[in-house]
Every structure is written in C-alpha cells, then in structure tokens.
Amino acid sequence: MHAILNTFKSGVGDCVFMRLIKDDATFSIMIDCGKYTPEINLFIKEKLHKHIDLLIVTHIDDDHINGVCEMLIAMPEITIGKIFYNCYQLLSGEKIAALTKIVSSDIEILTQNLPKQRTDTNGKINMEHASVLASILLKNPQWNSAWEKTFYIENSLEPYPLGDGLGQLVFISPTSSELKTLDMNFAREYLRLTRHEVINAPFE
C-alpha cells in the first residue's frame, strides 16, 4: 500500500486530500476546505470521480468549513462513504436536534446568501456556514446516512481503524477545551442570528 497526499491553497484555511492505494483499490480522504477553488473542483471530478470515502470536517471555524458548504452546493451528485463532522454540540455531549421549520427557514435564507467563492477568510467561527453545512447534510439522504452523528473528533480518541489493511487514523487535534470554546461561541451566535436557542435533543 502507498499513500498520496494532495494539499490545495484554500485562503488561510486548510484543504487536504489523502489517497490510500492498495492493489487496485483506492480509499480517498478529504479533510476540511476553507475555499472551494476550481483546482479542488477539478481534482474531485478527475481524480476522485466525484466520490470521497471519508470526509472529515474538524471544526466549525470559517477557514475549515466554508469550502465544504460550497462543494456540496456546487456538486450535489457527489457521493460520500462516511462523514466525520465536529458540528455544534452541547457541552453535555448531546447532539443538536434536527432543525425546526422556523429555524430551517432562517437557515434557508443564510444558504441563499452563501457566496459561491470566497477570496479571503478571517478564520473565525462562522455560525452561518456551520448551520448551512448541517442543514445540507441532513437534507440529502445519502450524506445524512453517511454522517456519523455520534462521532466527535478530539485528540483523546483512540485510533480509528480504516479496515481492509488500510491502517488507522490517529487524532492529534483539536483538544476538548478548544471544542468547548467553539461550542459556546456557536450557541451565542446561533441565538443572535436565528433568534432561537440551540435545541437540546438528539439528531433525527
């Protein structure tokens, strides 16, 4: 087996692809995307054939999440095997409920105003894009099914086996304290922009 690592300029954020190749099989991993560029779009179409085996969105800072939203909006036909997304989450560890109709309406407006391309990004928490990404994943049956909603990435996790002799993922960041800070910031921004409290109930 051998691995091919591809990185792309994505504003001040990250966009990393790893392809694990064993015999005739290829396993593709995408990690974050601050800006969905034409180069990334072409890579996904020509090298990955519009399929990602594992999409990892490490946290909801703008420079990690914006391009993922843009990718899914621009390429709704893309298939994804599994999704790890450190979505907004309560400190108790309970996940946020599926969006109410009222909140969904607010987020639809945010989605419509999401730019197709960003020329820069400030690297700060972005409530709009965090909500939009969750909404996009929940509405698409294939992506919704692929989203591991109980899996929350932090550096204290045990290594995650990929199976089929492909090795394992070792998580070295983010820390739980960093995620708690993001969670609190998100809850504050969510209330400010949607006028609704973050819902304390499991995902549907």
What positions do the PLM features span?
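Flexible, acidic/histidine-containing loops and adjacent segments that form or flank the divalent-metal
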Residues: 1-3, 74-204
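A short acidic (Asp/Glu
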Residues: 17-18, 65-70, 94-97
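Extracellular structured ligand-interaction cores
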Residues: 15, 55, 166-168
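Active-site environment of divalent metal-dependent phosphoester hydrolases
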Residues: 12, 37-38, 60-66, 90-92, ...
